[in-house]
Amino acid sequence: MDGTIENFVIYLHDVKKTSKNTEVSYERDLKKAAAYFKDQGIEDICESSEANLNSYMLYLEREKFAPSTVSRSVAAMRTFFQYLMKEKRIVQDPSEHLHPPKVEKKVPEILTVEEVDLLLSQPDTRTAKGLRDRAMLELLYATGIRVS
């Protein structure tokens, strides 16, 4: 593999300006895929075919990986093979027709009226900080903003 994955991670950082979390996740996903391919007799992940990638996706699903994990792995491989194309390491992108599984979006949990009342009653509105905190809580509640 001659440092190809490591060079890809450097490319993500330096050129794509990705987050550290993306870089760590993609590196882990690609190394896991490389280990799978090695077990299948493919020494270099760069030599993977479309059929190999589909086989790997089925393996992840059989092993009960979450759809979000499989989806991220697809994203990692697609970005990796696009990088290899850009670097002229491969002539055809085997991930071109790779599609991630559908990831169900979770319905956000909402607070009851009683919980909202309790939350809004917490700041001590007799102080400046309490008034500020109450105003922030009211703003968050009124706009429906959420933590992502």
Feature locations, PLM:
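Conserved catalytic core of the tyrosine transesterase superfamily
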Residues: 1-148
